[in-house]
């Protein structure tokens, strides 16, 4: 009987793509993939180690399955991903119940590692070089069947002072364009209609191997693939958003008019301490240009409150900036000191309660903005991809071009006719909720 393997993948879409490649390798080698990890022989926890809350979630999940192992319900527990890469020695010491701690560079060895564990019952620790970049082979898509993420690069070279990603995943390494297009074509052939392009910094794509950003050319090539209806790009850095990129997004029908652009702050001093560029004036000018070049664009951003040294005045400026710009989508996080980063050693740390309260204030303001934008959407007609049927609410739900999977809101809608999952329908907006919309199929 084939060994049953379950995967629990935590964290960001980039981590999810890694998990899908591992699942494919396991399936190809004869392992049985099970959706309920608690019913497996071997559990892989693909961890996130980005901020404190993510690390705690990963540890809690590992301990949960180690308990099942002690009860005899599963045979082995393996940790992969960012936390395993970052805290390899600590995890081996503090969680001896783990059968393997597998670094990011060794994901391709996962089948051999499982065989070794089951044969010898000896703990395994495996780490490959973080300079390697291999995403060959297929994937087992773990998202809803009609959309998938495609990772166009690994690592990061921006070296923001608050971020540990470069030390975990190495320097930025772009994939060859032909490899990305080949994988995208495979996804389209397997029923994916919405492609979501991801990397730590998508706008840097190609600089390391082609000598310049090739994101516009890559997006153009992806638009030529039959089968995709929507193509969405996440994680664009403001200083690398060029006129060429904006022109491509405006021109290509398959490219949704949606731009995810994490700015983190608007104060020049804070941004400089973060090792980021720009200030309120340059960001305002960029956003004005984006909205002029791409009418009806949906702008998403993320902010950090309580970064070391942030004064009340600088925070108030950030609040005013949010009110002025009126981002369509916004997420805000209280600064989390990360071990080994320069910002962790800054002396002027803001108290946790102040960091968290400032994040709450930003999100309260965004709620007002969201309410206003939703009210303006009343009586409009939008194209919606049906994601499923909400049996509790007795209606369908889906997303529009303005809503990225997993992070943005939903559109709930009634229909006299049966609507299939993955079907794209026209919906008239009749009512609003905090971040969601309610409508009826036309």
Residue ranges and their predicted role:
Residues 180, 197, 233, 261, ...:
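Conserved, mostly hydrophobic/aromatic
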Residues 95-96, 117-120, 213-215, 249-250, ...:
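Short, hinge-like loop/turn segments at secondary-structure boundaries
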Residues 310, 317, 325-327:
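Contiguous mid-protein beta-loop-alpha structural module that forms a pocket-lining wall or clamp
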Residues 1-205, 244, 255, 259, ...:
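Proteins enriched for Cys/Gly/acidic motifs involved in redox and nucleic-acid/cofactor modification
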Residues 76-81, 86, 91, 189-313:
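Conserved SAM/AdoMet-binding glycine-rich loop
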Residues 12, 206-223, 227, 273-274, ...:
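Radical SAM enzyme [4Fe-4S]-AdoMet core and its adjacent flexible, acidic
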Residues 345-442:
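Terminal RNA-binding accessory module
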């Amino acid at each position: 009987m084939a060994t049953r393997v379950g995967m629990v993948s935590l964290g960001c879409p980039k981590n999810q793509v890694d998990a899908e490649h591992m699942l494919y390798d396991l399936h190809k080698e004869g392992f049985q993939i099970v959706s309920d990890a608690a019913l497996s022989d071997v559990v892989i926890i693909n961890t996130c180690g980005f901020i404190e809350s993510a690390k705690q979630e990963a540890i809690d999940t590992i301990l949960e399955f180690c308990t099942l192992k002690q009860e005899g319900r599963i045979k082995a527990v393996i940790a992969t991903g960012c936390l395993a890469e970052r805290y390899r020695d600590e995890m081996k010491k503090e969680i001896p119940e783990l059968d393997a701690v597998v670094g990011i560079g060794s994901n391709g060895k996962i089948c051999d590692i499982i065989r070794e564990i089951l044969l010898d019952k000896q703990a395994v620790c495996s780490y490959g070089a973080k300079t390697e970049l291999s995403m060959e082979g297929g994937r087992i898509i773990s998202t809803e069947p009609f959309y998938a993420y495609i990772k166009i690069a690994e690592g990061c070279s921006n070296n923001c002072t608050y971020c540990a990603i470069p030390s975990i995943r190495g320097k930025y390494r772009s994939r060859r364009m032909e490899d990305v297009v080949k994988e995208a074509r495979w996804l389209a052939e397997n029923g994916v209609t919405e492609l979501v392009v991801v990397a730590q910094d998508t706008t840097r794509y190609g600089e390391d191997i082609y000598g310049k950003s090739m994101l516009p050319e890559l997006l153009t090539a992806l638009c030529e693939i039959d089968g995709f209806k929507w193509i969405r790009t996440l994680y664009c850095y403001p200083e690398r958003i060029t006129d060429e990129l904006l022109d491509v997004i405006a021109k290509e029908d398959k490219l949704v008019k949606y731009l995810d652009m994490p700015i983190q702050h608007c104060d020049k001093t804070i941004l400089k301490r973060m090792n980021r560029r720009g200030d309120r004036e340059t960001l305002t000018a960029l956003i004005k240009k984006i909205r002029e070049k791409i009418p009806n664009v949906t702008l998403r951003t993320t902010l950090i409150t309580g970064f070391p040294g942030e004064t009340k005045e600088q925070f108030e400026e950030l609040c005013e900036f949010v009110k002025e710009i009126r981002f369509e989508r916004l997420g805000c996080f209280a600064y989390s000191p990360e071990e080994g980063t320069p910002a962790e050693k800054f002396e002027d740390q803001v108290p946790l309660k102040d960091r968290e309260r400032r994040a709450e204030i930003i999100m309260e303001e965004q709620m007002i903005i969201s309410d206003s934008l939703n009210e303006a959407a009343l009586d409009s007609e939008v194209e919606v991809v049906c994601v499923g049927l909400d049996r509790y609410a007795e209606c369908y739900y889906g997303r529009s071009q303005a809503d990225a999977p997993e992070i943005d809101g939903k559109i709930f809608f009634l229909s006299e006719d049966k609507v299939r999952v993955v079907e794209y329908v026209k919906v008239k907006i009749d009512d609003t909720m905090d971040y969601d919309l309610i409508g009826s199929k036309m």
